[in-house]
């Protein structure tokens, strides 16, 4: 049996129903939360969520405030490479990746 919990919730989603449920879980279990999105979900062009990195972060912070989630909350990014731009030439795809990295950081 595990005597000490050494892991924390970490999710890679842009679904705000899932994010809300995860924040509530972390809140009531007094855990930090790590949230990531992929470059397909959120990027400088909006991704398939139509959210840019700063918009995604803002929506997360608004949600956290709404449900009074005051635990440690980390926002990360997953797969910042050129995959969403695989149909572009290599140089343009890499430039898009670099721009996304800068927008996220």
What function would you assign to each model-found segment?
Residues 81-105:
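Helix-rich catalytic cores of soluble enzyme domains
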């Amino acid at each position: 049996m595990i005597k000490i919990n050494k892991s924390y919730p970490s999710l890679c989603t842009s679904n705000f129903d899932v994010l809300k449920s995860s924040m509530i879980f972390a809140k009531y279990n007094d855990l930090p939360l790590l949230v990531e999105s992929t470059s397909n979900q959120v990027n400088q062009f909006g991704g398939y969520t139509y959210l840019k990195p700063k918009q995604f972060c803002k929506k997360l912070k608004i949600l956290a405030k709404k449900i009074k989630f005051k635990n440690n909350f980390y926002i990360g990014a997953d797969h910042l490479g050129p995959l969403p731009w695989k149909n572009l030439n290599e140089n343009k795809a890499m430039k898009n990746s670099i721009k996304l990295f800068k927008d996220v950081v």
